[in-house]
From Swiss-Prot:
It comes from Sulfurisphaera tokodaii (strain DSM 16993 / JCM 10545 / NBRC 100140 / 7). GO terms for molecular function: large ribosomal subunit rRNA binding; structural constituent of ribosome. This is Large ribosomal subunit protein uL11. HAMAP family: Ribosomal_uL11. NCBIfam families: PRK01143.1. The gene is rpl11.
Length: 170
């Protein structure tokens, strides 16, 4: 059973049945409209975000499996901030503000893909991304919050999410 793996990055819930995906699917003898609909259904919870998708196709039987990855950290943060794109000048132009708990949620979602061993370390990593794309967190600079996390000022809040962190795959 030879399989072909197709890796693509799509806009969640908004894949169109055109190039570059359609020609590849057609060559494999797949129904383009059906596959596109299934990808859109599978990624609908990530509307407006860039989502990695892997399509595993059995080239003999034409059966396929859609594996949806986790959107980029930047996409998740921008979604929480209701911002459309990162700042081109994050030091001077802020594009939005999110809650510290949103940072924790993103850290938990991204656990399978980040190297941090603890929730605290993961949160600091996500705060770094928030800083680099021009977001503030609870109206403060993410850099300030990294320092506050190091000083233990968020330990109680982080403790509330430890269970979710430990249950997350990764």
């Amino acid at each position: 059973m030879p399989t072909k793996s197709i890796k693509i990055v799509v806009e969640g819930g908004n894949v169109k049945p055109g190039p570059p995906l359609a020609p590849t699917l057609s060559q494999l003898g797949l129904n383009v409209g059906e596959v596109v609909k299934k990808i859109n259904d599978a990624t609908s919870q990530f509307k407006g975000m860039s989502v990695p998708v892997t399509l595993e196709v059995d080239t003999d039987t034409k059966k396929y499996e859609i594996k949806v990855g986790i959107p980029t950290t930047t996409s998740l943060l921008l979604k929480f901030a209701n911002a459309s794109e990162p700042s081109g000048d994050p030091a001077h132009k802020k594009v939005g503000d999110i809650k510290f708990e949103d940072i924790i949620q993103v850290a938990i979602m991204k656990k399978p893909q980040i190297t941090a061993k603890t929730l605290k370390a993961a949160v600091k990593s996500i705060l770094g991304t928030a800083h680099s794309i021009g977001l503030t967190v609870d109206k403060k600079s993410p850099k300030e919050l990294v320092k506050a996390v190091d000083e233990g000022k968020y330990d109680d809040l982080l403790a509330k999410y430890e269970q979710k962190w430990n249950e997350a795959e990764g």
